Amino acid sequence: MVTLAMREPGEAIDSPRIVAECGAAVLSGLHYLVARHLETGADPPEYARPVWKAYLEWLAEFPPAIRHQRLHASHYSFLDPQEVRFVTAELIDATCLSGAPEELAEKVRALERAGLSQIMLYPPLNRQYRVIEDFADKVMARL
């Protein structure tokens, strides 16, 4: 299961459109990394390091009794305006199937060569049909 971040021609991977479309899923991945860190002390992966300290500082502003709920408040459901600043190009690239249609087709081919036989997209509900149709028309048609 993966979130799709399909760039339009000339569009940055962290454009407002892509952040709005993928941000909740991207942040859910960051939430998992933070929860793991809080439980085990595990260091973040390289792609999360640019926002790591700032995110932990932001989370520490909340009372300990509600910190866990705050960490997962927007989990896969909406893009919290307070968290949007933590959605970076690095996080999008690391946690989503991202790129222009031709890049996505090559990534799918590489995954297939590695043994993947199915892919399940996890689009935002308000654009689910458009995302799936765009993937079919612009990526799957190239395979």
Q: Model-derived features: where do they sit?
A:
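Histidine-centered catalytic/metal-binding microenvironments
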Residues: 123-124
